[in-house]
Design a protein with these regions (language model features):
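A short, conserved structural fragment
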Residues: 414-424
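Short, amphipathic alpha-helical interaction segments positioned at domain boundaries
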Residues: 431-460
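Short amphipathic alpha-helical interaction segments
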Residues: 398-414
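C-terminal scaffold of the Radical SAM
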Residues: 46-47, 54, 77-101, 106-400, ...
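Local cysteine-cluster metal-coordination motifs and their immediate loop/turn environment
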Residues: 59-75
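Flexible, acidic/Gly-rich N-terminal and inter-domain linker regions that tether
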Residues: 1-55
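Minor-groove-contacting beta-hairpin "wing" of winged helix-turn-helix DNA-binding domains
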Residues: 425-429
């Protein structure tokens, strides 16, 4: 494969968003609140915005029993299991408030339980949660119903409960199989344990198993990560998410326990990425884009081939243009042309629900310019190409005129082999996929106007 040169890194490996949304969550505003969110829900229910798009649900379970030092998620570290029961009571309040505006029986084609650690909940609490959701929503046959699993918190019996509850996709947080790396990031889980769980998942009939990996963690080397990849290839999950570790200790306190001198240098981190791409593609995985891989017959790979890939707050998805109802503390949702976020602290979340309010505290109503740029950015992030005429027809604009400045900026990337510009469109090259966040940033009006990007991780 092509080699990422130091010159490319120096020029294009800059801090930038991951574009799970556009505009990105850092652009949300407290001027957008509960009333705006309720209006969006009511417009969906009344059909005033046209045909209802499919509905996706995200439920955030923030609790973890122990702290992983690399973590940048919104979580609560606690050994007090009773907190889950109390949280479940507030999730019920939140769901019931949604039902006031949407009615019961909205069809759901996608559900994701994330965290935190969803399996912090007991089997009975998970049963109560799913009963609550089924009481208020209609889960359609053939949908994608997934849950994030910490291998340290489950056994085959617990996986059987998840299957019984209707989950058909599992995502295991592995990160790295190297014991020294696991120790230094405070997440020890033997490889044998993960292998046994994945084998059990297959016996239980789960349609898809995902494994999360992180490169750039302390004490990792290209050679040690090669060994982790070899084990992952033996494991043969249906999907692999390969994330770059973003060391931002000024934003995420747990990362302050990681010593900077233990982190791999930039060249080593790039070597891990390029060698991972080689190893996984040679093993038969399809490179979906940026940080995702899938076996050729997995729904994600099929969606990419058919041009149906989408990107949402959980990463790449087969569920294009869903409305997303987000439940739980800090959750981010999307209804129509709006984004909304719940209160980030448990105290604020609970207080708002106790007052009878939906816990939305910030968000954004997208402008026409936002919507056009979102369609451009998502085409580049998901398909790696776009045709000017498709944007022209969808939005009744002239792409080359509207984005003349952006096309000029892309010429520098074309000169370095990252994109190909033609009379009809833009194509991201094989090398350009490494820097696709940077390609998308060219069309991000907010980032272009804001030179202070230290809140973002670097692209590679």
């Amino acid at each position: 494969m092509s080699v990422i040169t130091p010159e490319l890194l120096a020029r294009f490996d800059v801090p930038g968003p991951r574009y799970t949304s556009y505009p990105t969550a850092d652009r949300f505003d407290e001027a957008f609140g509960e009333a705006d969110y309720v209006q969006a829900l009511q417009q969906r229910q009344s059909g005033t915005l046209g045909k209802q798009p499919p509905l996706s649900l995200y439920v955030h379970i923030p609790f973890c029993e122990s702290l992983c030092y690399y973590c940048a998620c919104n979580k609560i570290i606690t050994q007090h299991k009773e907190r889950a029961a109390e949280y479940l009571r507030y999730l019920r309040k939140e769901v019931e408030l949604h039902t006031r505006h949407l009615g019961r029986g909205q069809a759901v084609s996608q559900l994701h339980l994330g965290g935190g650690t969803p399996t912090f909940m007991s089997d009975e609490e998970l049963r109560q949660l799913m009963a609550l959701l089924r009481e208020h929503f209609k889960f359609v046959p053939g949908g994608e119903y997934s849950v994030e699993v910490d291998p340290r918190t489950v056994d085959e019996q617990r996986l059987a409960v998840l299957a019984e509850l209707g989950f058909n996709r599992l995502s295991f947080g592995v990160q790295d199989f190297d014991p020294a790396v696991q120790k230094v990031v405070h997440r020890i889980q033997p490889a044998d344990q993960v292998f046994a769980l994945v084998e059990a998942s297959r016996r239980l009939g789960f349609e898809s198993v995902n494994v999360d990996l992180i490169y750039g963690l302390p004490l990792q080397t290209p050679e040690s990560f090669d060994r982790t990849l070899a084990q992952v290839n033996r494991l043969r999950p249906d999907r692999i998410a390969l994330y770059a570790y973003a060391h931002l200790p000024e934003r995420f306190k747990p990362q302050r326990r990681i010593h900077v001198e233990d982190l791999p240098a930039g060249a080593a981190k790039v070597a891990m990425l390029s060698r991972s791409l080689d190893a996984l593609t040679e093993a038969g995985y399809v490179y979906i884009g940026m940080d995702h891989f899938a076996l050729p017959d997995d729904a994600l790979a099929v969606a990419k081939r058919q041009g149906r890939l989408h990107r949402n707050f959980q990463g790449y998805s087969t569920q294009a243009d869903c409305d997303l109802i987000a439940l739980g503390v800090s959750s981010i949702g999307r209804i129509g042309s709006t984004y909304s976020q719940n209160a980030k602290t448990m105290e604020a979340y609970v207080d708002l629900l106790d007052q009878g309010h939906l816990p939305v505290v910030r968000g954004l109503a997208l402008t026409r310019d936002d919507l056009i740029r979102r369609s451009v950015i998502m085409a580049l992030m998901c398909q790696g190409h776009l045709q000017y005429e498709a944007i022209n027809l969808a939005w009744l604009v002239d792409f080359k005129t509207l984005f003349a400045q952006e096309l000029t900026q892309l010429e520098a990337m074309q000169a370095q082999g990252l994109v190909q510009l033609s009379e009809s469109g833009i194509q991201v090259t094989a090398m350009g996929w490494f820097f696709v966040r940077g390609v998308a940033m060219v069309f991000d009006r907010y980032v272009q106007a804001d030179r202070n990007r230290s809140r973002f991780s670097k692209i590679i």
